[in-house]
UniProtKB/Swiss-Prot annotation:
Protein name: Respiratory supercomplex factor 1, mitochondrial
Entry keyword Coiled coil: yes
Membrane topology: Multi-pass membrane protein
Family: Belongs to the RCF1 family.
Listed InterPro entries: Hypoxia_induced_domain, RCF1
PANTHER family: HIG1 DOMAIN FAMILY MEMBER 1A, HYPOXIA-INDUCBILE GENE 1 HIG1 -RELATED
UniProt keyword list: Coiled coil, Membrane, Mitochondrion, Transmembrane, Transmembrane helix
Coiled coil location: 86-142
Gene that encodes the chain: RCF1
Broad class of where this protein is predominantly found: mitochondrion
One Gene Ontology CC term in the entry: mitochondrial membrane
Record text on subunit structure and interactions: Associates with the respiratory chain complex III/complex IV supercomplex.
Length: 144
């Protein structure tokens, strides 16, 4: 069976979605607060380097370029250290999210199948009514 989801009128229901992008973003910032600090330090150093370049202050410009490199190093260290520290937790979270996704896909599939069964039953009922009407019309034609 392919990984593509089956179409259904239940796709718009919110119970099929667990964590929004904003919730994930805030959770990740809370888990690893040093990464945004590193981004901010790097951005600040770049901004100060730009201001120094415009002012013609080459000494401050070189200091800020070094600060930018330190900011990058700090950010990279925070990413690697956070990856090591939260590695096991992330694996467990991925397994949990995969289980939720499988459950959600199964619910969608079951809902879709129920919907198809209802449509099939309605179609069969309509065909039976149509056949009964045709039979009654033929009977009336024979008598008439």
């Amino acid at each position: 069976m392919s990984n593509t989801s089956l179409p259904s009128s239940f796709d718009s229901h919110p119970e099929f979605f667990q964590e929004t992008k904003w919730q994930k973003f805030t959770r990740r910032i809370k888990e690893e607060p040093l990464i945004p600090i590193g981004y901010a330090a790097t951005s600040y150093a770049l901004w100060r380097a730009y201001k120094s370049m415009k002012a013609g202050d080459s000494i401050e410009l070189n200091r800020m370029f070094r600060a930018r490199i330190y900011g990058h190093a700090f950010t990279l260290f925070a990413i690697v250290a956070g990856g090591i520290y939260y590695g096991n937790e992330r694996r467990q979270r991925k397994e949990f999210e995969k289980a939720l996704q499988e459950k959600s896909n199964q619910q969608k599939r079951d809902s879709w199948l129920r919907e198809l069964e209802i449509r099939d039953k309605e179609d069969k009922d309509w065909r039976q009514r149509h056949a009964a009407i045709e039979a009654a019309a033929k009977e009336a034609e024979k008598k008439g």
